[in-house]
């Protein structure tokens, strides 16, 4: 499943995939794979991404329940 919330949060901060990757010490390809839903990041990486974007884990990585 694509992670459009991550892509949207990254765009809202005006960061490229490479810039976000540099902030969290991973490759641009890793960020791309997470956004495409091809890679499930570790909890440590999820936390790093959230800190870089100023978001919560819930906001970026957990689907809303109805």
Language model: regions and residue ranges:
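Residues within the helices of the helix-turn-helix
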Residues: 7, 18, 47
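The alpha-helix within a helix-turn-helix
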Residues: 10, 21, 50
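Short, charged recognition helix plus adjacent turn
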Residues: 12, 51, 61-66
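A short, Lys/Arg-rich alpha-helix, primarily the initiator
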Residues: 1-12
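DNA major-groove recognition helix of helix-turn-helix/homeodomain DNA-binding modules
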Residues: 44-59
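Short alpha-helical DNA-recognition segment
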Residues: 14-30
């Amino acid at each position: 499943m694509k992670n459009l919330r991550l892509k949207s949060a990254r765009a809202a901060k005006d960061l490229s995939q490479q810039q976000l990757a540099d902030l969290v010490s991973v490759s641009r390809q890793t960020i791309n794979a997470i956004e495409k839903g091809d890679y499930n990041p570790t909890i440590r990486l999820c936390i790093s991404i959230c800190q870089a974007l100023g978001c919560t884990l819930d906001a970026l990585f957990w689907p809303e329940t109805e």
